[in-house]
Amino acid sequence: MWSHLNRLLFWSIFSSVTCRKAVLDCEAMKTNEFPSPCLDSKTKVVMKGQNVSMFCSHKNKSLQITYSLFRRKTHLGTQDGKGEPAIFNLSITEAHESGPYKCKAQVTSCSKYSRDFSFTIVDPVTSPVLNIMVIQTETDRHITLHCLSVNGSLPINYTFFENHVAISPAISKYDREPAEFNLTKKNPGEEEEYRCEAKNRLPNYATYSHPVTMPSTGGDSCPFCLKLLLPGLLLLLVVIILILAFWVLPKYKTRKAMRNNVPRDRGDTAMEVGIYANILEKQAKEESVPEVGSRPCVSTAQDEAKHSQELQYATPVFQEVAPREQEACDSYKSGYVYSELNF
């Protein structure tokens, strides 16, 4: 019985000493050999759906440390390591997955937490649109470039390029408005290609606009004459239509009305075109008197104003009569026969 009591007393004393030693060792490790771990990532700016890697490391390379990763109070994983950081691979798909994250390093009964780490979720920029305005002079070309990306988290940095060479510094825009860049160049002999780049805080992610090619002027020629010719022709056509509608047509209608109001005189018609029909001519013998039946004829005549007129004609009847006595005259010649004309 005494031996059993001695064993219990021995184990109680041993356990007490061990616990005190562990507490003393943990306190010593906390102050000297076991500082707080460090949680980091290669990038702090991500977009939704991006895979990321988080590194939890400790300055003490000689201890076997157990690393645990937490997002708020949710445990995400545990790894053991000695001298090397623990790597946790994650996928950021929702806004609440941006953080904060913490890493816990534990050795036996001693544990410490890292500082909070959070990601910044950024929407990527879409391909920008490049617009060019040109003012052409005899010797110079004044060019204004506008670049705008309609989607993407602000701020957005724009850079302009000419033939794949940057010609402007990064222009930051904190509002959804286009970046503008002006330049003046001598009339070139070759074609020039322009484009712009848009990027925000998302690293290693940039989009470019479609290239816009400016044709060469070829000396004093105008590269935009063809583009301006079509609007000019359309404007000229509109002007002609307006002139016809408001000036020529009313004038034509007035002249036509005046012509219709002029009185028509059939007797004084300058030109008369008639179509005659049913004219019968009969000749009798030399001894008999020719006699032709009277038949009315109808003709149609048109005056200058194109108005049709209906005219009636009759066939004359010839009768032989006795010759009358004529006074003698040197110039008179006999042998003529006169007839009466009856209608």
Curated annotation (Swiss-Prot):
Its annotated compartments are: Cell membrane
Q: For the modification Phosphotyrosine, which residues carry it? A: 313, 338
Q: How does it sit in the membrane?
A: Single-pass type I membrane protein
Q: Where is this motif: ITIM motif?
A: 311-316, 336-341
What the entry lists under SUPFAM superfamilies is as follows:
Immunoglobulin
Domain Ig-like C2-type: start-end pairs: 35-118, 128-213
Glycosylated sites: 51, 60, 89, 151, 157, 182
How does it get modified post-translation?
N-glycosylated.
Show the GO MF annotations: transmembrane signaling receptor activity
Q: Which UniProt keywords apply?
A: Cell membrane, Disulfide bond, Glycoprotein, Immunoglobulin domain, Membrane, Phosphoprotein, Repeat, Signal, Transmembrane, Transmembrane helix
Q: Could you tell me in which tissues this protein is expressed?
A: Expressed in myeloid cells (dendritic cells, macrophages and neutrophils, weak expression on B-cells but not in T-cells or natural killer cells), peripheral blood basophils and mast cells (at protein level).
Mapped to this chain, the residue ranges on the Cytoplasmic side of the membrane are 249-343
Q: Which intervals lie on the Extracellular side per UniProt?
A: 20-227
Q: List the disulfide bonds.
A: 56-103, 147-196
Question: InterPro entries given for it?
Answer: Ig-like_dom_sf (IPR036179), Ig-like_fold (IPR013783), IL-40-like_Ig (IPR040878)
Q: Which residues cross the membrane?
A: 228-248
One cellular component term from this protein's GO annotations in UniProt? plasma membrane
Q: Which GO terms describe its biological process?
A: cell surface receptor signaling pathway; immune response; mast cell degranulation; negative regulation of mast cell activation
What is the residue range of the signal peptide feature? 1-19
What is the top-level taxon of the source organism? Eukaryota
Quote the function comment for this protein.
Answer: Immunoglobulin-like receptor which plays an inhibitory role in degranulation of mast cells. Negatively regulates IgE-mediated mast cell activation and suppresses the type I immediate hypersensitivity reaction.
Quaternary state and partners of this protein? Monomer. Interacts (tyrosine-phosphorylated) with PTPN6, PTPN11 and INPP5D.
Protein name, as recorded: Allergin-1
Q: Please spell out the taxonomic lineage of the organism that makes this protein.
A: Eukaryota, Metazoa, Chordata, Craniata, Vertebrata
